[in-house]
Amino acid sequence: MDSQELKTLINYYCQERYFHHVLLVASEGIKRYGSDPVFRFYHAYGTLMEGKTQEALREFEAIKNKQDVSLCSLLALIYAHKMSPNPDREAILESDARVKEQRKGAGEKALYHAGLFLWHIGRHDKAREYIDRMIKISDGSKQGHVLKAWLDITRGKEPYTKKALKYFEEGLQDGNDTFALLGKAQCLEMRQNYSGALETVNQIIVNFPSFLPAFVKKMKLQLALQDWDQTVETAQRLLLQDSQNVEALRMQALYYVCREGDIEKASTKLENLGNTLDAMEPQNAQLFYNITLAFSRTCGRSQLILQKIQTLLERAFSLNPQQSEFATELGYQMILQGRVKEALKWYKTAMTLDETSVSALVGFIQCQLIEGQLQDADQQLEFLNEIQQSIGKSAELIYLHAVLAMKKNKRQEEVINLLNDVLDTHFSQLEGLPLGIQYFEKLNPDFLLEIVMEYLSFCPMQPASPGQPLCPLLRRCISVLETVVRTVPGLLQTVFLIAKVKYLSGDIEAAFNNLQHCLEHNPSYADAHLLLAQVYLSQEKVKLCSQSLELCLSYDFKVRDYPLYHLIKAQSQKKMGEIADAIKTLHMAMSLPGMKRIGASTKSKDRKTEVDTSHRLSIFLELIDVHRLNGEQHEATKVLQDAIHEFSGTSEEVRVTIANADLALAQGDIERALSILQNVTAEQPYFIEAREKMADIYLKHRKDKMLYITCFREIAERMANPRSFLLLGDAYMNILEPEEAIVAYEQALNQNPKDGTLASKMGKALIKTHNYSMAITYYEAALKTGQKNYLCYDLAELLLKLKWYDKAEKVLQHALAHEPVNELSALMEDGRCQVLLAKVYSKMEKLGDAITALQQARELQARVLKRVQMEQPDAVPAQKHLAAEICAEIAKHSVAQRDYEKAIKFYREALVHCETDNKIMLELARLYLAQDDPDSCLRQCALLLQSDQDNEAATMMMADLMFRKQDYEQAVFHLQQLLERKPDNYMTLSRLIDLLRRCGKLEDVPRFFSMAEKRNSRAKLEPGFQYCKGLYLWYTGEPNDALRHFNKARKDRDWGQNALYNMIEICLNPDNETVGGEVFENLDGDLGNSTEKQESVQLAVRTAEKLLKELKPQTVQGHVQLRIMENYCLMATKQKSNVEQALNTFTEIAASEKEHIPALLGMATAYMILKQTPRARNQLKRIAKMNWNAIDAEEFEKSWLLLADIYIQSAKYDMAEDLLKRCLRHNRSCCKAYEYMGYIMEKEQAYTDAALNYEMAWKYSNRTNPAVGYKLAFNYLKAKRYVDSIDICHQVLEAHPTYPKIRKDILDKARASLRP
């Protein structure tokens, strides 16, 4: 590290208050840069902050005359004297006078270091004075501006961060300044731009890999982005570089507590952390204290963890026994450990140290409440109430009021209102905080679980029936618990409570899943086994229920004292038909101390008694039922009478009435059952349940739909609320009367128009019945009554499906026509609407409007993502996915507009949101490939294949890239891998055939056809197979056979268009000649000008024209390609007027389409046919300067060959050879390139070399082109290879017996040369 890096490190440790670290780095600085007094100054400061005041004073005195640090040394002397137990007033006055004197003439560096020191000791305003003066005298020092920016952001005020960011950016203009980069990252983090901050930190790591605070910052930012895996990985990297890194060890311990719930590992890490603190910050009491806070609040009261952090707290208190907050925290620790008397002792100590400590007094009152000292606690709370205005609203204080109200048996509504207030106050302090250590401390899961437990004591103990609206208290509980479990998933108690709430809500599957999670992590969790038994029972899984009860008992014998345990056991025995055992079990439950009867006259308002009442009644009711099932009607009636007497006047009384009706029904007395239920009035708690029971009797026993509906109508009339109308609507749906159901749903909506879920449910129900017009009418009517955007979205989505684009556009514009919103849900809804609007515009072909809508959606989504991580963490993945979708759509539109740079930018942004989205990664890779950026494409494909090894498109792209790098083996390997997994993947096979052609290995193709046939016996009937066969035959010089196979694929939807294009090309150029070329024209002149040949060409052109009419392009580029082919047909006629017409079209396309290779080649070919060679050459030279791409590969090859032809005609053989070698680099099977090379060698009379090239041309034309055979035989003759010459002559004559001249010119001469 250089001097500047060491100073930045010191500044970082000063701000983090790691003073022993300051000492160590300063010592290193003195060792390396002894002449720099700044290191000596910070050595003295570190010494001072470790409590060695006299030693520090001596060190400051020794450097106070050093120019650069004189001012800060004097300020430090004043600070040190004031920290001393007996301050030297005279020395302070003397130093103060010298400060005032020196400040007047202080230089730039002196002012800077003074400002820096004042910032470190927390005197921001004074520091700003010094820095402003320093900036003024230095004419805008960047170093000064960077420090000023640090001052701005450590004040933590939003208006300052914008200005600070500008200063940091200015400070970075001359290079990478670690201090400025660290500040920029901090600034971006404060603005909740965690990704931007992370990028900045990565910049530090790249440029300064040994600067460990950057890794610490990276680790914390990754946690803020809620990426625990990356956080832990960075912590591990840190520990590899510094095994005693406090922050990394703390993060690892926190990970095991919060994320994994692995208490053993967390305990080990905490022990390591304690040892590290002893070694690295032995005097840092505040650090020992700070480290404990997050653990005590997230460990679920684990005694093992609490003991470890108690040791750290005691160490903090021993280092600074005057610190009241340390004693207060020790008191809190004792409460968590259940040691109330010791907690009281510590709280008293804290209040002795600081009489004004509110937190100590709050803890003290909590102890009084636990001990039942209600009067004393009440008095103390009254006192705190009086001073609450000055101390601000405190969730803990409101909670104590709620606990006191419960202890005093206050009304339920009063207690619940207090608990609601506790939650609102508690969560308000979390706003804007990123996920991190401070968030864990402030969230305080332990406190939240206490509140949830209090809520649950007011909730019904019986699970809700299906379709029953959720109890508001349960909804509140689930909201709190989900917040906790998202942040601290390792806290099993939270998961258990979620399971309990889900069970009570009637969501049995969710309850089961959460309990399974609990028991996987802690098999001995007795309460979880007990709740799981209830879950199994509700699912009719009786044997599993019994097993859970046995496990529960084996882990905790105390459950035998729970009435609930016996109740579940009896219910399971009843389900198994063990009625006598169930009766015994219930009688055992009745004898438990908790079941002692209390008459109506001795009712208690104590809520715990009420909770027990629910379980007690359940045992009575179960006993009634089992006696009935056992044929003991008299016993059942007797228990029922006992229950009526026992629970008369309680909230459970109506349950007894319903049980009485059930008993009558079981005895077959339907009339008595209905009569009993009829007596339940609307004023009684279980009125709805009673009427539902009546309705059930009418429908199942009387088969009377009219009376069934009458019950629900009565509920709606007597209790005209949304829930009642919802039940009525569901009842109508149950008897298949949807029109009446809709009326009921509308009444529910009229009373609760803001219930978007209800409104959406109704609309979607209409859609499911295919009643689209009614659904639209409903949505429109609902919107007129003031419904919000969620219904607009549903309506617009329906209109889009129905292709009513204009109406969809109007609906969405209406939804978005409002004042700017800040509510997170409203921002989310606006974002969704903008995305849907963009889809509508795309369908309407209003591309500009579509892009505008997407840009607005992107801006909205950026705002959502900044807030959603803290406000709705469970929504983060969906919102990131939407952000990625928006960026990807913008990128697609950019590609359509040929703005590739913009497209790349947005695809990359999409991947920031969804790093592993395969579709986006693939599109970006394709774009890189099209932009001729193979390295980026390769990286993207490699990343994609890491997550999806079988991705076909990525594998094919990798093959293309390997080919470009001339790594042919790898290219073929990638495609072979795909084909070995799926031999009948014809898309891959077609690409492999092309690649093997370019590799010069077409002889390897047939085995892949065999593989496909083995995989699929009907392969030969597949259009894809026929297409691939045609391709292979075309490439191996069998155009007629190729046409036959392409013809079999030409009607197929997937393969037809490509087959047609290939057939047209074969028709126009069956022998693969260089169209427009002149080199071989004269050699084959007598063949080319024959009448038979001309007639054949005309027939082929007519066939091509017919085939063109079958082409049905679906894209803009497809239509351009069709025009190109049409004009190649015109050129094929060789008629001047047709060629000129084609030339005009090609020119037009080339003018409108940037660098359109096929059009440019078309122009050059037309010029050649028109004998305007210079103009042709100019176009071909343009193409020769362009970068090769796979899409235009064939056109590139043809243009290079044509240009080589021109050069050969002009005897510019070197230039021609370069182009021909380029052809062969990209296509080793290019027989025309070999033929031209052979021709050049022949002209240069290098017959041996000519023969070698003609050999390759003969090989890759599959020995089917007699002209090539003739030339090869001729050059063998010239090279005196007579036998080889004779062999080739025989091969040519065998296939073409009348081929002219070869017998006379070559065969006879070769034979003559062999004769002695």
UniProtKB/Swiss-Prot annotation:
PROSITE patterns: TPR (PS50005), TPR_REGION (PS50293). The keyword Endoplasmic reticulum does not apply. SMART domains: TPR. Keywords: Cell projection, Ciliopathy, Cilium, Cytoplasm, Cytoskeleton, Disease variant, Intellectual disability, Joubert syndrome, Meckel syndrome, Nephronophthisis, Obesity, Repeat, TPR repeat. It comes from the Eukaryota. Changing Q869R: Found in a patient with Meckel-Gruber like syndrome; uncertain significance; hypomorphic variant in vitro. Changing M844V: Found in a patient with Meckel-Gruber syndrome; uncertain significance; functionally null mutation in vitro. GO terms for biological process: Bergmann glial cell differentiation; cerebellar Purkinje cell differentiation; cilium assembly; forebrain dorsal/ventral pattern formation; intraciliary retrograde transport; negative regulation of eating behavior; positive regulation of canonical Wnt signaling pathway; positive regulation of gene expression. Changing L795P: In SRTD4; functionally null mutation in vitro. Changing R939Q: Hypomorphic variant in vitro. GO terms for cellular component: ciliary tip; cilium; cytoplasm; cytoskeleton; intraciliary transport particle A. Transmembrane segments: none annotated. The keyword Ubl conjugation does not apply. TPR repeats lie at residues 108-141, 145-178, 180-211, 285-323, 324-357, 492-525, 563-596, 617-650, 722-755, 757-789, 791-822, 831-864, 884-917, 919-951, 952-985, 1023-1056, 1197-1230, 1232-1264, 1266-1299. Changing R867H: Found in a patient with Meckel-Gruber syndrome also carrying a homozygous variant in CC2D2A; also found in a patient with short-rib thoracic dysplasia without polydactyly compoud heterozygous for causative mutations in IFT81; probably acts as a disease modifier; functionally null mutation in vitro. Gene3D superfamilies: Tetratricopeptide repeat domain. Its main location: cytoplasm. Changing I1208S: Found in a patient with Bardet-Biedl syndrome; probably acts as a disease modifier; the patients also carries two mutations in BBS1; functionally null mutation in vitro. One of its GO terms (molecular function) is chromatin binding. It is linked to Ciliary dysfunction leads to a broad spectrum of disorders, collectively termed ciliopathies. Overlapping clinical features include retinal degeneration, renal cystic disease, skeletal abnormalities, fibrosis of various organ, and a complex range of anatomical and functional defects of the central and peripheral nervous system. The ciliopathy range of diseases includes Meckel-Gruber syndrome, Bardet-Biedl syndrome, Joubert syndrome, nephronophtisis, Senior-Loken syndrome, and Jeune asphyxiating thoracic dystrophy among others. TTC21B is causally associated with diverse ciliopathies. Component of the IFT complex A (IFT-A), a complex required for retrograde ciliary transport and entry into cilia of G protein-coupled receptors (GPCRs). Essential for retrograde trafficking of IFT-1, IFT-B and GPCRs. Negatively modulates the SHH signal transduction. Component of the IFT complex A (IFT-A) complex. IFT-A complex is divided into a core subcomplex composed of IFT122:IFT140:WDR19 which is associated with TULP3 and a peripheral subcomplex composed of IFT43:WDR35:TTC21B. Interacts directy with WDR35 and TTC21B. Interacts with TTC25. PANTHER family: STI2 PROTEIN-RELATED, TETRATRICOPEPTIDE REPEAT PROTEIN 21B. Belongs to the TTC21 family. This is Tetratricopeptide repeat protein 21B. The lineage of its organism: Eukaryota, Metazoa, Chordata, Craniata, Vertebrata.
